C-alpha cells in the first residue's frame, strides 16, 4: 500500500505537468517558450525555496553540490526545449515525444550507469505506454509533425530523464523538498539573464500573470514537491514511466479545451497508456508483498 502511495504522488504530479501545454496555449501570443519556461522556474523555484525555509527544511550541509548543479542544468535545458517543442509541433505530439522518450532514456541510463536492471513490470508498462504514445499521434491527418520540434522534444525527454536519475541519487542522503527547491532556484538563475533579451511585457497582462502563476505555483512547486516525495519510494525508471500520465492529460486537455482532434487509433493509444500506468502503479505493492513473503 505504501508503495502505491508513492506512485500516486508521481501520478498527481504528472497530471499537473500535463496541463502546462494547454496553459501555454492560453497565455498571450507574445509569450515566448523561453520566457515562459524561465518564469515557470523563477516563480516555482522561489515558492519552493520559501516553503522549505518556512518549514525549516533548508539544511545544505554535506550536499553533493556537483550533482545539484548537474540536475539544475538538466531542468534549465528542459524548460525551453519542452515549451518550444509544444509550440512547434503541437501540444499532444510535443508532450508525448518529450515524456514518451524519457522512460527509455532513464531505463537505459539506470541500467548502464547504475547497473540496476529495471523490473519486469517496468518493461511491460513501458512497452504498453510507448505503444499507446505512438498510436496517440500516428494519424498524421490530425496532427502536425515538425522535425525541429520533434528534436527539441527528444532533448527535453533526455533532460527530464537526467534530472530524475540525478534527483533519485541525491535524495538518498538529502531531504527531497529542499533538494528540489535548491535545484529549481539554480535553474531559474541560469535562465533569468535570458529574460533581459526578450519581451516580457506580456506577464503584466491578466492572462500573462494568471498563466505564469499557475505554471509556477501549481505545475511546478506543488507538482515537483509531489514528484520528489514519490521518488523516495519508487525507482527512477518507474517514476519516469509513471510520468507518461502527463501526455495522457495533455492530449485530453488538447481535445476538450484547445480543439485538437484525436482519431479512433489515438483513443486506443490512450487506453494502452492507461493500462501501462496501471501495471507500473501496481508493481510496488506486488514487490513489497513478495519481499514480505520471502522474509517470513
Swiss-Prot record:
One of its GO terms (cellular component) is membrane. Residues 15-138, 158-282 form the EamA domain. The keyword Kinase does not apply. The chain crosses the membrane at residues 8-28, 34-54, 63-83, 89-109, 121-141, 147-167, 183-203, 208-228, 238-258, 261-281. Its main location: membrane. It is a multi-pass membrane protein. InterPro entries: AA-Vitamin_Transporters (IPR050638), CO/AA/NH_transpt (IPR004779), EamA_dom (IPR000620). It holds the Pfam family EamA. It comes from the Bacteria. It is found in: Cell membrane. Keywords: Cell membrane, Membrane, Repeat, Transmembrane, Transmembrane helix, Transport. Belongs to the EamA transporter family. This is Uncharacterized transporter YwfM. It comes from Bacillus subtilis (strain 168). The gene is ywfM.
Amino acid at each position: 500500500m505504501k508503495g502505491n502511495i508513492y506512485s500516486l504522488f508521481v501520478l498527481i504530479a504528472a497530471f499537473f505537468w500535463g496541463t502546462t501545454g494547454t496553459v501555454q496555449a492560453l497565455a498571450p501570443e507574445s509569450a515566448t517558450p523561453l520566457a515562459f519556461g524561465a518564469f515557470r522556474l523563477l516563480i516555482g523555484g522561489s515558492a519552493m525555496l520559501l516553503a522549505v525555509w518556512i518549514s525549516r527544511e533548508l539544511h545544505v550541509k554535506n550536499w553533493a553540490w556537483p550533482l545539484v548543479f548537474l540536475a539544475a542544468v538538466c531542468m534549465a535545458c528542459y524548460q525551453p526545449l519542452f515549451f518550444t517543442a509544444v509550440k512547434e509541433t503541437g501540444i499532444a505530439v510535443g508532450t508525448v515525444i518529450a515524456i514518451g522518450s524519457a522512460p527509455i532514456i532513464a531505463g537505459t541510463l539506470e541500467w548502464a550507469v547504475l547497473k540496476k536492471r529495471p523490473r519486469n513490470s517496468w518493461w511491460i508498462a513501458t512497452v504498453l505506454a510507448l505503444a499507446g504514445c505512438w498510436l496517440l499521434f500516428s494519424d498524421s491527418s490530425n496532427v502536425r509533425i515538425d522535425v525541429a520540434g520533434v528534436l527539441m522534444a527528444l532533448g527535453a525527454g533526455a533532460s527530464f530523464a537526467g534530472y530524475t536519475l540525478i534527483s533519485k541519487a541525491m535524495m538518498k542522503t538529502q531531504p527531497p523538498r529542499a533538494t528540489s527547491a535548491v535545484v529549481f532556484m539554480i535553474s531559474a538563475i541560469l535562465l533569468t539573464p535570458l529574460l533581459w533579451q526578450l519581451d516580457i511585457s506580456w506577464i503584466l497582462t491578466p492572462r500573462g500573470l494568471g498563466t505564469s502563476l499557475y505554471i509556477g505555483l501549481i505545475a511546478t512547486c506543488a507538482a515537483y514537491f509531489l514528484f520528489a516525495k514519490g521518488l523516495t519510494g519508487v525507482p527512477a525508471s518507474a517514476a519516469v514511466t509513471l510520468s507518461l500520465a502527463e501526455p495522457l492529460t495533455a492530449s485530453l486537455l488538447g481535445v476538450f479545451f484547445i480543439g485538437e482532434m484525436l482519431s479512433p487509433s489515438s483513443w486506443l493509444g490512450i487506453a494502452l497508456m492507461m493500462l501501462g500506468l496501471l501495471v507500473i502503479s501496481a508493481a510496488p505493492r506486488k514487490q513489497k508483498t513478495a519481499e514480505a513473503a520471502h522474509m517470513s
